[in-house]
């Protein structure tokens, strides 16, 4: 090995242009490796972020948001169940699943079992789901064992509410779920004003009714 290294070093000294090319190539490999390593770390390293928002229109409300799991690509069902058990300890008022929970690489069994795991999270007012571009959009299920309607049926079977241009009014809050912008098809998503009009009159704020 040392002999090969010395021969390589001698060649680079005799031909400077190759030394520049070699150095540039090594630098590119190192940068790429660091970039991929950083991405892999972020995929596998789940971080909880807390936001404390103030409003005089609602009493204390704990909302748990989960997004971009890309099941089986970045997270196994076993890992997800462990996190769901931990999140249950938060005793959230409601849980929102905001897209790309699944993608085209998620096996059917993992989609089904992940839906069960997510449904097991302890909450007071329900679990709500909106599609992302990998759930029901431009990248959705191109080579998958299942489609968006299978996702909907499985989630709803487990008691998770799918919101696609729909409104749910709870005692102290209105939840609006929009259709993903990347998948309009022949049925464009509703505007914000149209969705607001779907809120029952007795659940609207004074600003909206005026």
Task: Identify the function of each model-found stretch.
Residues 9-24, 48-55, 79-92:
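Short, charge-rich amphipathic segments
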Residues 1-43:
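Non-catalytic terminal accessory segments
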Residues 57-210:
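Soluble catalytic domains of enzymes that build or remodel membrane lipids, polysaccharides, and related
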